[in-house]
């Protein structure tokens, strides 16, 4: 299941709770066409990769989280291990998203 992050505190708690697991964060917006396009694929990945934590951040609802993470465009996918960012890319690229998960997991 993809967890919707609604505050900076919830984001920090989710990263901490993940422990050694890979955390994939989808920074998106409701008005963003490419975000809508890749969202079903992103959600399907949580079934395929049960050992990975999937988070979703709406940049309009959580502007502080997006700013802290230096998100400049949507969609942006960031990858965290043990609370530290290990990777990032922007764009609705399904192949790159899945390849990044297998690389960092």
Swiss-Prot record:
The active site is at residues 32, 35. One of its GO terms (cellular component) is extracellular region. One of its GO terms (molecular function) is protein-disulfide reductase activity. The modification N6-acetyllysine is found at residues 3, 39, 94. Its main location: nucleus. The record marks 33-34 as: Contributes to redox potential value. Pfam families: Thioredoxin. Residues 2-105 form the Thioredoxin domain. SUPFAM superfamilies: Thioredoxin-like. It is found in: Nucleus; Cytoplasm; Secreted. The keyword Signal does not apply. The modification N6-succinyllysine is found at residues 8, 94. The modification S-nitrosocysteine is found at residues 62, 69, 73. PANTHER family: THIOREDOXIN-LIKE PROTEIN 1 (PTHR46115). Participates in various redox reactions through the reversible oxidation of its active center dithiol to a disulfide and catalyzes dithiol-disulfide exchange reactions. Plays a role in the reversible S-nitrosylation of cysteine residues in target proteins, and thereby contributes to the response to intracellular nitric oxide. Nitrosylates the active site Cys of CASP3 in response to nitric oxide (NO), and thereby inhibits caspase-3 activity. Belongs to the thioredoxin family. This is Thioredoxin.
């Amino acid at each position: 299941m993809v967890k919707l992050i609604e505050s900076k505190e919830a984001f920090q708690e989710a990263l901490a709770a993940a422990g050694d697991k890979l955390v994939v964060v989808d920074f998106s917006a409701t008005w963003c066409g490419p975000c809508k396009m890749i969202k079903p694929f992103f959600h399907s990945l949580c079934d395929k990769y049960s050992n990975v934590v999937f988070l979703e951040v709406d940049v309009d609802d959580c502007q502080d989280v997006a700013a802290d993470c230096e998100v400049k465009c949507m969609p942006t996918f960031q990858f965290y291990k043990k609370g530290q960012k290990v990777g990032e890319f922007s764009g609705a690229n399904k192949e790159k998203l899945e390849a990044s998960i297998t690389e960092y997991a």
